[in-house]
């Protein structure tokens, strides 16, 4: 497979769109035709988008390994096949999108899955490529519903979690949504709240404009100016998704590059130089598309109660944009491999955080709790041959030699060396101890510093955000409850050493079901009563620690 002339080339979707606009319509039309085809397949067809999208979370049809266990077994909760927060995150998703691409090729031979180049100049300035947000597309002389815009469920979905309030269940005919809309329709109360919220946003074109403004804000980081971070800018840009993607390419080894659990611990163990895992900017894009806004957007404002499907692991892969996003994540994985000499070999640090099936999200079907994860762990449910052997990470290290595809030109092919911020502190802020089990799904931690001047007036500095892509009811996974700690690190190099010493630090948490950002009291370690009321059945309270380290 190594001959470049035989490789399938995954191109930027924006390049396909530009080629279409210049008159060469076939590549983009073939892509649309293939996506239309897999969405129209019967829902029990293994190539159907319903089946493929469901591997990541709902509809949970393939859970025999779990359902056969006694109801009181700690392993009975299952949230899908996907791997997050562990060393299998990049490789599992590599095979996942390959299977989606193979389904597309069964409809239109030769078509490849393009990537959404999330760090390109066009994306940073304009947001999502138009073909992914256009409601209709002309194909074969007919104006059809664009299959890249959304997906309409042919069957209802259920998360099958005992005692859940079913807010994330979806009926047949449900159409996936993105920011600023809400897709919570599982209960009468949720449907009423969603109808009221979505009625505020009746215009798809204006909704896309809001979505793109949100994406751009996340890419840059907060702040109204267009400059990079400085020691005197109270709302610096430069700590957004684009910066995170650039930063992750310098991760020193596969273990910490691969996932947020390993990277979080690595930053505690190696405080002199922080790392960013590939999974972190990946999480941010999920939440940006799926309903979370970011401070400092100016006139676009902040849309409370948005609940897009991309913002929750259970439903994310049912939005077609998921696969264009993950194609870019896989491209970044390949760029890291090429730029750091790991094209043919990856290594996992045995016994490190993020190398156990119980870390972060908990185990997936067929992988018992407490199982060490390595490059030979099966990437279920994906089968590689006629003998029923599962794919492992060893089968997908070199995408050109082993899988027969490569990537066309894109941003960060030659990653720029970030210019150091002169005069800033070398310290970082560490927030830890927050339990994901307290939250119904994904949430965002945001860190701030307040510094008094000589007159006692406070200046607020926004330090950055840490997105946590999660799923509802992780607390139902009894085995996972001791593995739900979130560790977040925020560089303080936009503050001078003097300001770092004077500052008071605090965080806010934006989460589902709460329209306000809550300032969490550092002294008591407790949140506002509103959060506790949502999960009153939990005996514990939201607590965390903040520390400034060298």
UniProtKB/Swiss-Prot annotation:
Cofactor note: Binds 2 copper ions per subunit.
Entry cofactors: Cu(2+)
One Pfam family here: Tyrosinase
PROSITE patterns: TYROSINASE_2
Coiled coil: none
Entries under InterPro entries matching the protein: Di-copper_centre_dom_sf (IPR008922), Tyrosinase/Hemocyanin (IPR050316), Tyrosinase_Cu-bd (IPR002227)
Function of the protein: Copper-containing oxidase that catalyzes the conversion of L-tyrosine to L-dopa and then to L-dopaquinone. Can use various phenols such as p-coumaric acid, phenol, pyrocatechol, syringol or pyrogallol. Accepts several of the constituents of lignin and potentially participates in lignin functionalization.
Protein name: Tyrosinase HcTyr2
Source taxonomy: Bacteria, Pseudomonadati, Pseudomonadota, Gammaproteobacteria, Oceanospirillales
């Amino acid at each position: 497979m190594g001959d470049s002339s035989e490789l399938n080339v995954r191109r930027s979707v924006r390049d396909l769109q530009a080629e279409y606009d210049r008159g060469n319509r076939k590549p983009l039309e073939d892509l649309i035709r293939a996506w239309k085809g897999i969405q129209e397949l019967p829902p029990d067809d293994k190539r159907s988008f319903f089946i493929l999208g469901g591997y990541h979370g709902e509809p949970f049809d393939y859970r025999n390994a779990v359902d056969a266990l006694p109801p009181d077994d700690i392993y009975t909760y299952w949230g899908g096949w996907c791997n997050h927060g562990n060393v299998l995150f990049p490789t599992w998703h590599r095979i996942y999108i390959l299977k989606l691409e193979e389904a597309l090729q069964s409809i239109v031979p030769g078509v490849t899955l393009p990537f959404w180049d999330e760090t390109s100049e066009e994306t940073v300035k304009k947001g999502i490529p138009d073909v992914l947000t256009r409601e209709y597309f002309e194909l074969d002389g007919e104006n059809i519903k664009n299959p890249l815009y959304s997906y309409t469920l042919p069957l209802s979905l259920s998360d099958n979690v005992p005692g859940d309030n079913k807010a994330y269940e979806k009926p047949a005919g449900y159409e996936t949504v993105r920011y600023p809309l809400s897709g919570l329709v599982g209960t009468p109360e949720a449907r009423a709240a969603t109808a009221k919220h979505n009625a505020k946003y009746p215009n798809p074109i204006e909704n896309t404009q809001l979505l793109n403004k949100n994406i751009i804000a996340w890419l840059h980081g907060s702040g109204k100016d267009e400059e990079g971070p400085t020691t005197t800018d109270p709302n610096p840009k430069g700590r957004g998704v684009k910066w995170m993607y650039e930063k992750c390419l310098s991760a020193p080894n596969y273990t910490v590059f691969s996932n947020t659990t390993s990277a979080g611990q690595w930053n505690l163990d190696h405080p002199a130089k922080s790392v960013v895992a590939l999974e972190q900017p990946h999480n941010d894009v999920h939440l940006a598309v799926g309903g979370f806004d970011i401070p400092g957007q100016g006139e676009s404002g902040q849309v409370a109660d948005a609940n897009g499907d991309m913002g929750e692991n259970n439903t994310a892969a049912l939005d077609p944009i998921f696969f264009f996003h993950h194609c870019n994540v896989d491209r970044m994985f390949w760029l890291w491999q090429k730029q750091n000499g790991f094209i043919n070999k990856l290594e996992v640090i045995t016994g490190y955080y993020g190398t156990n099936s119980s870390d972060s999200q908990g185990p997936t079907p067929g992988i018992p709790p407490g199982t060490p994860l390595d490059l030979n762990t099966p990437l279920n449910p994906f089968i590689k041959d006629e003998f029923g052997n599962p794919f492992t990470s060893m089968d997908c290290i070199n995408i050109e030699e082993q899988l027969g595809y490569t990537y066309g030109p894109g941003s960060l092919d030659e990653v720029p060396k970030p210019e150091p911020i002169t005069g800033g502190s070398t310290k970082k802020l560490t927030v830890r101890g927050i339990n994901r089990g307290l939250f119904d799904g994904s949430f965002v931690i945001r860190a701030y510093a307040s510094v008094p001047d000589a007159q006692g007036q406070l200046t607020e500095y926004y330090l950055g955000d840490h997105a946590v892509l999660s799923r509802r009811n992780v607390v139902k996974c009894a085995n996972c409850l001791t593995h739900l700690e979130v560790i977040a690190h925020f560089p303080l190099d936009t503050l001078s050493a003097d300001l770092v010493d004077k500052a008071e630090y605090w965080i806010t948490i934006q989460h589902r079901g709460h329209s306000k950002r809550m300032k969490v009291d550092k002294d008591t370690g407790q949140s506002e009563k509103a959060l506790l009321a949502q999960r009153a059945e939990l005996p514990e309270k939201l607590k965390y620690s903040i520390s400034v380290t060298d």
